[in-house]
């Protein structure tokens, strides 16, 4: 018998991020991770369904999905670097976080699903996957020029040289459809949502919100063609947003996440506060309050904040007052190595010396 859907989703994320040590929920983000599609797929077959088919037929796609999931966790660590829970994933505690329906878990599922879609789409455009390539020409007209070559802008007047006849889709557009399809196939469970399975509904919604953060923020890039710098013809294509931008937008959604509960039949979600409007497709959802993450707690997966570096003069989340949960902080002088005396050598290398510098750090008690 298959494990419950939420368990399969969490297990799959663990498989993607640490295939060689999934049995112990061993996490090694921050150290070199060797991608082994065979190892992932040997474990993933326990999940059954189309994931196993993808493993057998397209292991190179699975490798990109895993790369994208790790990209998502690194982005989570960047966006949460000043928070009490900083997306640390070096221990079993991360697995316990994934088993809760809290805001932080919503962000993790969204950013890893987004990373999977982003990585596969990028691999297609780079010619690294044989199953896909550039985006097919679109049916709608590309944007009109704004007077600055190479930049999209408002439509030109009818019958002018800037009319639609001079503009067409071309280049190598990023095929987000293919990336979404593979992310959805492997990151989402194919089985029907169980009755009363609110966690599955929440996690699947957050996965889709992550992919939407990639798709809805693709940008149009154009290039002019013509003699002497003229723009006799202009080709345009769709380009993925930088993943840092995807992470920033999902962080905004994290701050405005909606708490939900299930309907009586367990097949849909409603706002926990009935007076609020239902959440949209791009919103992140959660069903339980987060712990305060101040002290270590094996049950919740909280690592605590003792020993974390903080900013003694900042009033925000990175400040010692908030990050240290009122316990206070101590000063410590440490010696670090940094790049210094960097010089550019033609062509095209930047060479630096390594210098030792002493810095004063504030650390939570």
UniProtKB/Swiss-Prot annotation:
What GO molecular function annotation could you give as one example from this UniProt entry?
Answer: cytokine activity
State the Gene Ontology BP annotations: axis specification; branching involved in ureteric bud morphogenesis; canonical Wnt signaling pathway; cell fate commitment; cellular response to retinoic acid; cornea development in camera-type eye; epithelial-mesenchymal cell signaling; nephron tubule formation
Ranges annotated as biased composition (Pro residues): 140-158
Subcellular location per the Swiss-Prot or TrEMBL entry? Secreted, Extracellular space, Extracellular matrix
Q: Where is the lipid attached (O-palmitoleoyl serine)?
A: 228
Q: Which GO terms describe its cellular component?
A: cell surface; endocytic vesicle membrane; endoplasmic reticulum lumen; extracellular exosome; extracellular matrix; extracellular region; extracellular space; Golgi lumen
Record-linked InterPro entries: Wnt (IPR005817), Wnt6 (IPR009143), Wnt_C (IPR043158), Wnt_CS (IPR018161)
Q: List the disulfide bonds.
A: 76-87, 124-132, 134-172, 222-236, 224-231, 294-325, 310-320, 324-364, 340-355, 342-352, 347-348
Q: Which UniProt keywords apply?
A: Developmental protein, Disulfide bond, Extracellular matrix, Glycoprotein, Lipoprotein, Secreted, Signal, Wnt signaling pathway
Explain the post-translational modification. Palmitoleoylation is required for efficient binding to frizzled receptors. Depalmitoleoylation leads to Wnt signaling pathway inhibition.
Which Pfam families does the annotation name? wnt (PF00110)
Subunit details for this protein? Interacts with PORCN.
Instruction: State the family named in the UniProt similarity comment for this chain.
Output: Belongs to the Wnt family.
Stated name of the protein: Protein Wnt-6
